[in-house]
Structures are given as structure tokens and as C-alpha cells.
Amino acid sequence: MPRTLFHDIDPARVRANLEEVTGEAAGRAEVLVACKYVPVEEMGALVEAGVGLVGENRQQDLAAKHEAHAADFTWDFIGNLQSRKVRQILPLVRLIHSVGTDSVLEQLGRHGTAETEVLIEVNVAEEEGKGGVAPAGLADFIARCPVRVSGLMTMPPFAEDPEASRPHFARLAELAAANDLERLSMGTSQDSRVALDEGATIIRLGSALFA
């Protein structure tokens, strides 16, 4: 994924790419447009392209973009979640995809409401140094979450071959079923088709839509 901001976004190109992906996902998954690398002044191009659901990775960028386009999109938070940012993020989003630490649970207990809904990030591959709850501890973590948990999210180890993600996505689907959870946020531009095969209900796309 590019690490520089997208400029001069072509709404027609985004619309065409989005329509193709939405057609593939129809009846199975929502298409979330990851806007981490979209500057606030380019968000209007996403409006013009017909984007409805966006995900942001940083609290500060979420606040700035939401202020400019609050009513234009449904907003999710998909980035690394710092406990000290929970209070600022909650009022702006439909879902937080990345709950995975006890300190975040504490802040959700303080600032969550009856409407708060989250996904638990699961470190399915149990990679060292990577965020998320280990599969063995998932049921206990869900039980301790003070707000509604509606699903799970994962980021599998990066691999050139999208098929390498399949066992990790399949495992997340098994964990969701075992815990009676409906939402599965998995799959990015690189492996979204595999994620759809394995039951994703939200796929998170960025560079694939802007190219």
C-alpha cells in the first residue's frame, strides 16, 4: 500500500472500481473504503464517486474529515486503537474494528453507551508484536467487554499470494461462529476475494479503488 497521500483522485475511476467490487460482494459484504491516505481536501472526490462507508486509522484525521463530511459517509475506525483516544472516537463512528486490549475495555466502560458497537481484533496467526487478542483468550475477552461486541476483525500476515490468507480468514470465521458473532471484518485490497470466499461481511479497500 502506498505510504504517500493520494491526490487528484478521479471520482469516475473510483466509482467504476467500487461498482465492480460491490458487485462481487453483493449480498455478502459491505465495502469499506479505507481513507488513511486520502487527505481531507480529497474526500469530496469520494462523495462524488458514491462512496458510502469509510474507515479511518487515526483519531486526528478522523476528527478533521468527519468535521468536513460528517453527513456524507458512514464512519468506522479501523486503525490501531489507543485507549486515550477512545473517548474522542466513539461519538464519530458506527463501529470500532480494533478493540484488543484491557486498557481499551476500561475506556469503553467509562465512555461507551447502549449504542456503542465494536469488533474485537484477533491475532489469528499469533504473530509476536502484533496487536489483537489471541484465539485462546477470545471468549474471556468478549465476556469482559462492557459494550456490544458484534463481530471480529483480523489482519493476517502479509503475503504476496492472497491464498496465504485463506486459513487465517477461515479460522476467524470459525471463532465468530463459536461466539455467536455476525460481523467479520477481513480482507483488504490484496486479498479481499479470498476473504469473501471465507465469509467476510466487511472488506476494507483502499489502493485497489484509487488505481
What positions do the PLM features span?
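Conserved alpha/beta-domain cores
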Residues: 1-190, 196-198
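Paired acidic/hydrophobic, glycine-rich loop segments that form the ligand-binding mouth/hinge
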Residues: 55, 203-204
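Expand to "…catalyze enediolate/carbanion chemistry for C-C bond making/breaking, isomerization
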Residues: 193-197, 204-211
